[in-house]
Amino acid sequence: MITGIVVKNMNGYFYVQDDTGTIHECKVRGRLKKGRYSLLVGDRVTISEDGFVESIHGRHNSMVRPAVANIDQVVLVVAAHEPDINELLLNKMLVMIEHADIPIVLCINKCDLMDSDTEAMVELYKSIGYDVLMTSTYDMTGIEDLRHVLQHKVTAFAGPSGVGKSSLLNAVD
């Protein structure tokens, strides 16, 4: 038996990274599909040599959106502009993550496009205690700071479509 962490879920296959860094393509046995918990990215699991998830280890946290477990922090990404910040959606996501008791880093991407209204909003979130990181993949502002925030932590990226989550991940890679 091999233990590892689920790093990807795609088309019914779960990709499990073992302690040596090897990725195993796995399926879930029927009895686990009918169980109390569905398998999430971040779950620590035991897998068989023939590529089946045999058991799911305990979780210390989990979220529904994004569907992840056992994470150290969430980087919640919004864009300063294009698309404009939807404050209602941002606040809903903050509440959801806070409810899961997971530390949050609020990342304002595309900061090179920031206007005074967005600056005032950023100051408000800072004043109530959120860690705020300003980034831009256009001029690479804050990318080193983001690398530092990610170091030695299991992190989920969340945020609306088009805010630059993938661009940020590519920039820190």
What is the role of each PLM region?
Residues 1-85:
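N-terminal accessory targeting/assembly segments
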Residues 165-173:
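A conserved segment at the C-terminal end of the G1
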